[in-house]
Design a protein with these regions (language model features):
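Well-ordered secondary-structure scaffolds
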Residues: 1-271
Length: 271
């Protein structure tokens, strides 16, 4: 295996974090590129929180925000993962990654190309394997989750969340209007159906309530003071009230996807 191989991951949300954690656990060097204002809701298991906090930790993995590519080496020496704000990917060429993983999960390609690394991998729909990237990994819950796709694309986004505890679309909450999101509860709280968990302050100063449809644990919640538009995802409820620890653990879905990415990375590096 190539010594000091570099895996560059675009995105630091919860699914991306699952992949980064698996690669880091395997002893690989990983660099995360993120947006200036990440909008993850599963913030307790998202390395992108380092953008706001300076550093964060998920299941023993410490992530540290850096301001320049040159600072990455010092973070790696600390057995941590550097996070660089670089939504345009300007640092990709100078970083010369051995593998690039697009884990932005934007449901469309925001600029990743096959020539960015010897192996390019994309998670989820919006990419065609063999054209936009070398390989695509399926992200839709179900029998095909984690499947490695070398020709074609992942299943298109349906806009309907996967079923957890018997609930699908009811467990995900979206903004009903534009404004500034203000939380009233925190991740890990048990909430009841119909409860107000946040408010949105509109341009005219009105406060619009954000309510839940089901009872459960508040597994994900958008960072307070974040600007939202109608339909913007702001919260995620887990109906399994006994599963509080899930708020702070990488999900089964993220780990399944991560396993496929690790398989691809190892195959590439052992060539």
């Amino acid at each position: 295996m190539k010594k000091d191989a570099l895996i560059l991951v675009r995105g630091g949300g919860d699914l991306a974090t699952g992949t980064v954690h698996r690669l880091w656990s395997a002893g690989l060097r990983v660099l995360v590129l993120e947006a200036e204002h990440p909008a993850a809701i599963r913030r307790q298991v998202s390395l992108c929180e380092a953008v706001y906090e300076g550093e964060t930790a998920v299941e023993g993995l410490r992530a540290v925000r850096i301001e320049t590519l040159a600072q990455a080496e010092e973070v790696w020496k600390q057995n941590a993962v550097p996070v660089l704000v670089d939504p345009q990917g300007k640092s990709i060429a100078p970083a010369k990654p051995d593998v690039l993983v697009d884990a932005i999960l934007a449901k469309k390609n925001l600029g990743t190309t096959r020539d960015m690394a010897p192996l390019t991998i994309a998670l989820g729909p919006g990419f065609t394997a063999g054209q936009d990237v070398d390989v695509v990994v399926e992200t839709k819950r179900g029998h095909r989750l984690g499947r490695i796709i070398r020709e074609g694309s992942a299943i298109p986004d349906t806009g309907i969340p996967g079923i957890i505890g018997g609930y699908g679309k009811e467990r995900v909450i979206h903004a009903g209007t534009a404004g500034i999101f203000m939380d009233l509860r925190k991740i890990g709280d048990i909430v009841e159906a119909g409860e107000t968990i946040a408010q949105i302050r509109t341009a005219d100063g009105a406060m619009i309530s954000v309510t839940t449809q089901i009872t459960g644990i508040l597994r994900g919640l958008l960072r307070s003071s974040y600007p939202v538009t109608p339909g913007f995802k702001v919260a995620d409820i887990d109906p399994r009230k006994e599963e509080l620890s899930n708020c702070f653990l990488i999900s089964d879905k993220a780990r399944c996807i991560a396993g496929s990415v690790l398989e691809l990375v190892c195959t590439q590096l052992w060539k």
